[in-house]
């Protein structure tokens, strides 16, 4: 990655959607561009900025002279944490209220003696209000869709699913009567997909459903961007990226971002130390993993937004216990809907010699640890990519959004996962864990995951497809005048 040669640094303003899974890859890309010579302003919501300071310490977001944090309001009541867990509310509020404070921030930055003028914007694919600001200020904007390419294609096709009468559902019975098994064979670049494999916001009977219409609007507005960035790589999703390229502005597949990010030299440790976690990390789990045999531990983490019932928590607990496998299980605050997650005391007693529970962890490092043999996951895109980079096979339990699409591809196209299909029952979970860790199917998936790991490393190595895509999006878009 050659640094930018310029008398005055280019200044990129980054705007992630205010959720953990969106902030993480956005921060990795921001740090990479800073390493390449960009001045960075990273814009969190006021609410999330405060949460990060609480989880990481009061100086965590002091930044560096060339990497600054700023905030804008999200339009919701300042102290209402529940409102931030209501995704439709957050999407509706940010899309309607954030433009004016964002433009005011850009004006402030442009007149600040402490930073060069803003030269480009890198914004989340679902923060398209920023496009109006880019147009107003006459600067290029790249949209970073933090989804898989197959997930993005699912969203891009929402308007056709509506046109064809496939969504909204005609009747609540359609959720469970086999309707979701309807084959969808007309989406360019996608094969062997069903209605149930589309991003989950189609699962509504409400013709005015906020998320359905929000995603139609955001994908349509994406056409105004100077370019689109995806955190994927050509070998993994070439067919669907090619199809997307006929529907959207130029697409640059620059992932998995964690690989070039990990290559930033140690003299930039101040930059690498800038964190993005909304929860405090437990790093003790890495020491615990050091005591375990290679490929012996099941890692369990359902991400930052999944919610389950207490009954499901209990069934997962006993499924893990009965498998007799060592496990590291991340149970974040809020995992169980409306109550504190409490695993059965008998489960704790039964597994005390082989299990570890924590509330959050440095997942990338965990998935790169030699002790990890399998990953029970919600199949968010970051988790899927991080597993690929570690060569770790998956048991998939999707919660919402494009996780359903990621699962379909993980299990049928990429050969790295098995899906929990149906109700969460302890015997079923026990059987899947044993299959993953000891069975022939698990061995095949591990072999496939290691093949993808090597292809990901090839893509991000010098002259690899993702390496060149990142160089090109910098030189052709971010350092060029707006068309």
From Swiss-Prot:
Underlying gene: UGT85A19
EC number(s) on file: 2.4.1.354
UniProtKB keywords: Glycosyltransferase, Transferase
Transmembrane segments: none
Reaction catalysis annotation: (R)-mandelonitrile + UDP-alpha-D-glucose = (R)-prunasin + UDP + H(+)
Protein name: (R)-mandelonitrile beta-glucosyltransferase
Gene Ontology MF terms in the entry: quercetin 3-O-glucosyltransferase activity; quercetin 7-O-glucosyltransferase activity; UDP-glycosyltransferase activity
UniProt record similarity statement: Belongs to the UDP-glycosyltransferase family.
Pfam families per the UniProt record, alphabetical: UDPGT (PF00201)
CDD domains, sorted: GT1_Gtf-like (cd03784)
Taxonomic lineage of the native organism: Eukaryota, Viridiplantae, Streptophyta, Embryophyta, Tracheophyta
Active-site positions on this chain: 22, 124
Binding site for an anthocyanidin: 22, 401
SUPFAM superfamilies per the UniProt record, alphabetical: UDP-Glycosyltransferase/glycogen phosphorylase
PANTHER family to which the protein is assigned, alphabetical: GLUCOSYL/GLUCURONOSYL TRANSFERASES, UDP-GLYCOSYLTRANSFERASE 85A1-RELATED
Protein's job: Involved in the biosynthesis of the cyanogenic glycoside (R)-prunasin, a precursor of (R)-amygdalin, which at high concentrations is associated with intense bitterness in kernels of almond. Stereo-selectively glucosylates (R)-mandelonitrile to produce (R)-prunasin.
EC primary class: transferase
